Regions:
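Glycine-centered recognition micro-motifs in short, flexible terminal segments and loops
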Residues: 2-26
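P/S/T/G-enriched low-complexity
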Residues: 2-8, 29, 36-469
Length: 469
């Protein structure tokens, strides 16, 4: 009987569509319920991943990078995650696992979580929740505490007019000067112009430049340093006064100190290491190198003109700087050391006859007495290498040496180092080699030295946080 009924049911074609539909409804409902719950779980995971991203980034912001208590760092990340992870549809707010790894100035934060998304069809899946998990990793290097040593060229070549218009005005304004200083683009500073006491009728070219309101390259350098240490500078962080250094120190929550040195034929101390604000009060003492008169740099030591020893300036600063530290706030650590060299890149100095000048220097070199010669050459980078080998960075701003094709001395002594252009010649190449990677900039005559020096400083001082996963 039962067998016959089953066979009859199997061979009966009436209502077969309804029966098939009824039979397939069970897996269809199962699939629909599972799909809906899975989709909702994925959406929750995306939202929780965003919360983990925010928590990781929050823990590597500049203000947090100075925090050495890992419990505080973890608590900050957990609080940010909890605020963003309080989502409807979760069985509870998940508690993240926060891992803090510090390596020197670098900090890596990993925020991971496991959560339970509530299912709308628990009976279909046979479970009340769907588990989701994820993680986010952020890494940043804190801006280190740094000591900055400004090393500024104040040799006579920095007395060039700041722009072509200033150069033209300088040449015109010196048309009545003695023959050695007449129609000259440089505002050289002589204590005894024409080897006589200064007077209303006997002026050096610097006096002429000031009387005619001519801006010199040294003025632009001075203004650039002022922008760094004094301002005005509009800082994104409210309540910060001063210049770029004070602003970046506040933004990075770090400590900067600054020293100012100049060089001509020797190293000159303007301000030893102190706060940028205190150093800024001494900027007015950045002055052009004075000479007694032409061919007499130092009175009673009259031999020839000279006055630019870049390598000597670097060596002098190197002897002053202590061994660099890591720049962290950890006990016993000390700041990093950074040299900022601003120069036109050409040395003009006395060397022993037994020493060597650049092979491309024009020979015979002018003799100075029985033991010395005058050497004009691009910077010899050996002094730079010595500094960098100590772990000290060098930032270089090259105020490009102006090509002077009409000047006989330039054509004979300098042109071979400054071709095919001031941006690409040997002078520029040597300075770029002197600089630490990424810390070289150049500015042509008429360019904005303040902006160039500020950009270079910000490049040294900047730190960023980034998600790596």
């Amino acid at each position: 009987m039962l067998r016959r009924a089953v066979l009859r049911f199997g061979s009966d074609r009436k209502a077969n569509v309804a029966i098939i539909f009824a039979l397939t409804m069970v897996p269809i409902i199962f699939l629909l319920g599972m799909t809906l719950d899975y989709t909702l779980a994925l959406r929750k995971r995306e939202q929780l991943n965003a919360a983990a991203d925010a928590a990781a980034i929050a823990a590597v912001r500049p203000a947090m990078l100075t925090q050495t208590d890992t419990a505080v760092v973890k608590a900050t990340a957990e609080a940010v995650f909890a605020a963003k992870a309080n989502l409807p549809g979760l069985s509870s707010v998940p508690t993240p696992t926060v891992t803090v790894t510090d390596t020197g100035l670098a900090r890596t934060i990993t925020v991971s979580y496991t959560a339970q998304s509530i299912n709308n069809f628990p009976g279909v899946l046979g479970k009340q929740t769907w588990q989701v998990n994820g993680s986010a990793t952020a890494r940043a290097s804190s801006a280190p505490n740094m000591n900055f040593y400004m090393l500024l060229d104040v040799s006579p070549s920095m007395a060039l007019g700041a722009t072509q218009a200033d150069i033209d005005k300088m040449i015109s304004a010196t048309s009545s000067q003695p023959s050695y200083a007449r129609n000259c683009a440089f505002a050289c500073h002589e204590i005894h112009p024409n080897n006589q006491n200064p007077s209303s009728t006997n002026k050096d070219n610097l006096t002429v430049a000031r009387a005619n309101n001519i801006t010199l390259r040294i003025d632009l350098v001075t203004n650039a340093v002022k922008q760094l240490m004094v301002g005005p500078w509009t800082c994104p962080q409210s309540g910060v006064s001063g210049g770029v250094m004070q602003c970046m120190a506040a933004l990075n929550n770090t400590t900067y100190k600054a020293a100012i040195y100049t060089f001509d034929y020797k190293l000159n101390t303007v301000q030893t290491l102190t706060t940028p604000t205190t150093a800024g009060t001494q900027i007015a003492n950045i002055k052009l190198m004075p000479v007694d008169h032409q061919n007499c740099v130092i009175i009673n030591q009259c031999s020839t003109d000279y006055g630019s020893d870049i390598a000597g300036g670097l060596t002098g600063v190197n002897n002053i700087m202590p061994a660099p530290g890591g720049g962290t706030n950890q006990a016993g650590d000390t700041p990093q050391e950074v040299v900022f060299l601003v120069t036109d890149g050409v040395e003009d100095k006395l060397i022993l006859k037994s020493a060597s000048c650049d092979p491309a220097a024009t020979y015979p070199l002018p003799a100075v007495g029985s033991t010395q010669v005058r050497c004009q050459q691009p910077l010899n980078t050996a002094a730079c290498t010595t500094i960098k080998n100590r772990g000290i960075r060098i930032a270089v701003l090259y105020t490009e040496y102006l090509q002077l094709p009409a000047d006989d001395w330039y054509k004979k002594k300098i042109a071979q180092f400054n071709n095919p252009s001031s941006s690409t010649g040997m002078i520029a190449q040597r300075l770029q080699s002197c600089a630490s990677p990424g810390l070289y900039a150049s500015v042509q005559t008429g360019g904005d030295i303040s902006d160039a020096l500020t950009d270079l400083f910000i490049k040294v001082a900047s730190s960023t946080a980034s998600l790596v996963q």
